[in-house]
Swiss-Prot record:
It comes from the Eukaryota. PROSITE patterns: GLUTATHIONE_PEROXID_1, GLUTATHIONE_PEROXID_2, GLUTATHIONE_PEROXID_3. Keywords: Acetylation, Cytoplasm, Lipid metabolism, Mitochondrion, Oxidoreductase, Peroxidase, Phosphoprotein, Selenocysteine. GO terms for molecular function: glutathione peroxidase activity; phospholipid-hydroperoxide glutathione peroxidase activity; protein tyrosine kinase binding; SH3 domain binding. The record marks 49 as: Subject to oxidation and hydroselenide loss to dehydroalanine. Expressed in platelets (at protein level). This is Glutathione peroxidase 1. Homotetramer. Interacts with MIEN1. Catalyzes the reduction of hydroperoxides in a glutathione-dependent manner thus regulating cellular redox homeostasis. Can reduce small soluble hydroperoxides such as H2O2, cumene hydroperoxide and tert-butyl hydroperoxide, as well as several fatty acid-derived hydroperoxides. In platelets catalyzes the reduction of 12-hydroperoxyeicosatetraenoic acid, the primary product of the arachidonate 12-lipoxygenase pathway.
Amino acid sequence: MCAARLAAAAAAAQSVYAFSARPLAGGEPVSLGSLRGKVLLIENVASLUGTTVRDYTQMNELQRRLGPRGLVVLGFPCNQFGHQENAKNEEILNSLKYVRPGGGFEPNFMLFEKCEVNGAGAHPLFAFLREALPAPSDDATALMTDPKLITWSPVCRNDVAWNFEKFLVGPDGVPLRRYSRRFQTIDIEPDIEALLSQGPSCA
C-alpha cells in the first residue's frame, strides 16, 4: 500500500481496532480488533537505547501485575532514532536476552516486527496515534533535539521524538494519552488503574 493510501486509512480510522501488525516471532498479522475491551499500552522500543533496561523491565512489570486485569502491553521495535534497533527481526529477542537488558531477560508482552513510526513509511497505527494525540501530555514541546538524527520525511510537528514514547489506549480502542520518552513506563500505572477500574467497554 502506498504512503498516500496508508495516510488516508489512518485518517479514516476511529480506533486502533482498524489496524494490525505482524508478531516479531512471525506468523499471521494480529488484528488489534482482537484486543477489544482491553486497555492497551503501546510503545516504540529499541534494544540499544540508554533507557532500554529501564523501559523493557517496567513494561514487563506492568504486564505481569496488570495483565490479569485487562492490560495488554504492545512493543514496536523501531530503528529511526539513532539506529538503536539495528538488529534484524530474528535477532532482537537474543539481543534482549543476552545484551540489554540481558541476564536471560524475556519480554512477557507482545512484540511486533520492526516498523517506522514517522515519515512516509510510518506504520498506519502510529500515523493514527500521532494524529489522535499530537504531543505528549507531560511535555507538549517534545521534539527531536538533534536535526542530524532526523532520517525520515516528511517531518511533522506530531512526530514521535525518540525511543519509548508511550500511547495509552482505552478499552474502546480510542487513544487517551501520550507520554514522552522521559516519562517512566511504570509511572503510567495510576492512569492504567483508573481505566481498569471502569470495567470493560461494550464498544
